[in-house]
Amino acid sequence: MDSNGRFHSDWCSMIYSRLMVARTLLTEDGAIFISIDDREVENLIKIGNEVFGESCFVGNISWQKTYSPRNDSKGIPAEKESIIVYGKNLEWMPKKLPRTAEMDAKYKNPDNDKMAWTSDNPCAPGARTHQGMVYAIQHPFTGEMLYPATSSCWRYDQSTMFDYMSGWCEYELKDIGDNVERAKICGIDASEVRKDVKAIVLKKSLEESKKNAEYVLKRGQWPRFYFTKNGKGGIRRKTYLENVDGRMVTNLWPFAEVGHTDEAKKELKALFNGEIPFDTPKPVRLMQRIVQIASEKDELVLDFFSGAATTAHAVMLQNTIDNGNRHFIMVQIPEKLDGKYANLCEVGKERIRRAGKKIKEESPLT
């Protein structure tokens, strides 16, 4: 039946009407996440583009829903499911995720600085449009003139860079007649390059400058821009852990981070004393991530296809984690079930009661 034209037409009409209502209910800074399999994902995006506007399309997330593909599957076994995301307005962006211990472990403190840091690129793109940030910096250990990479400029304006470099030894600004070199970096003719940009050069002799720089190197707490290979290498920039935000949300969500279908069934089984009253639940971690990146602590979360109320479970759990006060509305057709519960709505209501009780008992906030 799923493959006939009438079913497909009815599905499209149902989704279209639901999305129209959803768009009306969304706040201006809201977003919608729609889970769909491969068969209808293309049609869903077409409908979503019509309802929300193509410019409000945020992404197509691939959720790795299984850790063990079925051997008896016909064709290519499906390991992932799509989650289509639209914002109410084109400026909507997901919140960043908390950093992991593995990410933070990359930050070290070899020079006994005020905080841990990692080595980063001293340059930024945009040489042609930022010609005032393309100039030479003289190496305090070797005397070599250092320039940004091709098509790049230094990360900060010259005044800021001058202050950072002065942490190694005394510097001064000087015209060294390097317009040709600077023009090459900018990708323009020498006649077009900005002419009033001076180099940051050593104020004293290389011998004196090197002596001072070696003292700073041994002392520790190096300036923000430092030199690799014990002073003999190139220039790099410190990025401090304290100044780094969370990690960006990507369109690949592996089961190791957000759970899989077997995990979802085990969660239901644990709540319902060994029973699994619904065959296709979503894992709590999956819905919790959506709540985490798409809502503020005091917002309302609506699920149009709530199923076994995993979203409600996730909202309650996230509230305990970040001390939030989110509320939820679960919408579900009372689909009849075989077994203890008459319909799917009863399963959802019972899950909310049981999950809420469990979370309250285990929460450090209560």
Where are these regions (language model features)?
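Conserved S-adenosyl-L-methionine
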Residues: N4, H8-C12, R39-N43, T280-K360
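Short, intrinsically disordered, charge-balanced linker/junction segments flanking boundaries
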Residues: K360-T366
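Class I S-adenosyl-L-methionine
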Residues: M1-L300, D322
